């Protein structure tokens, strides 16, 4: 699955801090359709490391419990692309950000793989959905093949994981 165009010249220090998962999109809805779906995660914070990697603090559902997890995304030659070992080795690509309000990123299928599942998220600094940014998110994902569904955060900003 081809990931839409990534951002040029990502400044890691500028993406540091608290974020909220506002909307999620999947090329295969089974990746998101239940609380324990493999890529249904809620990003809470991004922390750049001194080595240029990106520590991601997230919440996910596991056995009807909301679990906090820290994963480290390893830098690549492209400043907007990282690799992460999360249920297999995957590629994370930052599509766009204005640093102050929103960030769009996609998590690709396990590498190497013929799997086509991809999940993209719209992160915001606040829990309020900006309709203009939502439109921009939708446009950024147009190159994705297959049936794409946008799921706005069902928790409405309440306890992430929705139990």
From Swiss-Prot:
SUPFAM superfamilies: Lipocalins. One of its GO terms (cellular component) is extracellular region. GO terms for molecular function: retinol binding. It is found in: Secreted. Disulfide bonds join 66-161, 106-120. InterPro entries: Blactoglobulin (IPR002447), Calycin (IPR012674), Lipocalin (IPR002345), Lipocalin_CS (IPR022272), Lipocln_cytosolic_FA-bd_dom (IPR000566). It holds the Pfam family Lipocalin. It comes from the Eukaryota. The keyword Secreted applies. Its main location: secreted. Keywords: Disulfide bond, Milk protein, Retinol-binding, Secreted, Transport. Belongs to the calycin superfamily. Lipocalin family. Monomer. Lactoglobulin is the primary component of whey, it binds retinol and is probably involved in the transport of that molecule. This is Beta-lactoglobulin-2.
